[in-house]
Amino acid sequence: MVPTSALPRSPGHPFYAALNKLLAEAKFDAYVEGLCEPLYREGGRPSIPPGVYFRMLFIGYFEGIDSQRGIAWRCSDSLSLRSFLGLKPTESTPDHSSLTIIRQRLPKELIEQVFSFVLTMAFEKKLLKGKSIGVDATTLEANAAMKSIVRREGGGTWKAYLTQLAKEAGIEDPTDDQLRQFDRKRKGKKTSNDDWQSPSDPDARITKMKDGTTGFAYKAEHAVDLDTEIVVAADVKPADQADGETVKDTVVDAQGNLNDATKQECRITEVVADKGYHKTETLVWLGDRGIRTYVAPRRDTRKRRWDDKPEGWQEAHRENQRRTGRDKGKQLQRKRAERVERSFAHVCTTGGARRTWVRGIVEVSKRYLVTVMAHNLGVILRTLIGVGKPREWASMRGFLATCAALWLAILADLVAAGHRVAELASDFADQLLRPRWHFSTSPEAASSTAC
């Protein structure tokens, strides 16, 4: 028998303590428990509180862990994270299989409601304006391998397809090495999404990845408030859908999330995007809804024809081109390139969302949306306490320690030179405004002072 007083305890990480305080002020746990209550039944084994489930996924973002197994192991290994989850010293942390069961139980609509609740928290902190929206997309690596692709019709494998082509080319009973050489040298090689799919994840699409390779992926699209860097909409779509078409759904989702978060009519007035989103039909669609577009135009190799296009298309195209050429349009494009890309860097690169370990577009969307929630919470905390991730807290503490050491070193040198304490502060403040260290002292003191 070991008394609980003898068990190891942790004072908790200051960053996670600040995050818990923010969630407690907004009554986050009570809100998500009210939403999830109809999905749980009375009796049976005690379930994991919804607040603990969301906190564990938040930890995946803040610690840069992409898999649920890694999150479960990290939570069980760290006393400070156990304190963040609100677990007693004698309680065990949830298993990764429990996270899977809860994710499958919660519908996507419920996750979207929690996402809107986090936007409400940002609005109450005056971090949500929703006037100028930047839109961009990136690819997410799916949990599917190219070597296992099969035909959409018939389910034939890639090896069987190559064997048939090799026999037609005159190679009887080809070996695996001969098939690889034949596949490497043959002309007109294509792998179309219309013909091939992954047997383990049919929703994934074949596309070109960020590193130049070809693989199965999804497309994640962000709509970011360019004034505050809050992500107001994030959804996962098939990777083969064009940006000019998916932006419509993203703008509609962003408008609905803003209305739900602010509890009032909050109209988007400007949409900024790169040239991948330049489609005249989309420009007209946005203009009909009172939204000014700042979409970078594509470089046309030949003169465009407008006599076969509907009325208003040419005017929408030219108005967008004029707006992007002005100083305001260039400034908004710089903001988009900086802040929207930064959201992808935080969520996908350092947040662990670039590689997904779940399958199906709905499950991937739910998992990704929770990661974007954590990103928005990090933006709020960066405004309140100056840091948005635990790593930033450690680097800031090191910076403050360096400044304090520099302060003490300067004070020690000046006191040793015989200066009064009152002159110390004024001299040091004066030196901050100069490009070099220079002390106006007597020749005797100057000779004995080295700085």
Residue ranges and their predicted role:
Residues 80-86:
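Secretory-pathway/luminal and periplasmic proteins that interact with or process carbohydrate-rich
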Residues 40, 60-61, 83, 103-106:
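Short amphipathic alpha-helical interaction patches enriched in hydrophobic/aromatic residues
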Residues 9-58, 63:
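Basic, short loop/linker segments at the boundary and entry of helix-turn-helix/winged-helix-like folds
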Residues 1-9:
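Generic start-of-chain signal for non-secretory N-termini
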Residues 5, 44-47, 87-89, 344:
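A short, ordered amphipathic alpha-helix with a cationic face
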Residues 66-76, 87-451:
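Anion-binding and metal-coordination hotspots
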